[in-house]
Amino acid sequence: MGYTHYWTQTRDFTPQEMNKINGELLDIVKVSGIPLGGWDGTGSPEFTTETIGFNGKGDDDGHETFRINATRKLPFEGASPDRLGWAFCKTAAKPYDIVVVACLTVLAAKHGFDVSSDGGAKDWEDGVKLASKALGEIFTNPMRREEAA
């Protein structure tokens, strides 16, 4: 299954801003109760002032890594400069997908990320609810804005 989320990080972040983002996204991880691993599904998720990265835990529940960096990067060597900060994560709708969706909801609402997805607003509802519960704020479903456009 190729269920994928896409985003563009519109600016670089300072270490202080990354610490704030780390706190927000770690709250989501804790409230979710979903086991997460490092980039390859083993070990621990990475939450530093340079990088945030995680995957589902193990071979069955992991798929592709969700990663953001303090400094925007091109998605691949030779990519057009207008792709600076663009990335994606194919979750295949595995259990960690709800955490990815919740994180992208917060990043879009509070940190200027542009997000899109193979899924629609209904597919994002549980992730948006998780973000709201974890941070104690009401978040708008970013896919509702995309569908209205």
What is the predicted function of each stretch?
Residues 1-149:
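Acidic (Asp/Glu-rich) sequence patches and key acidic residues
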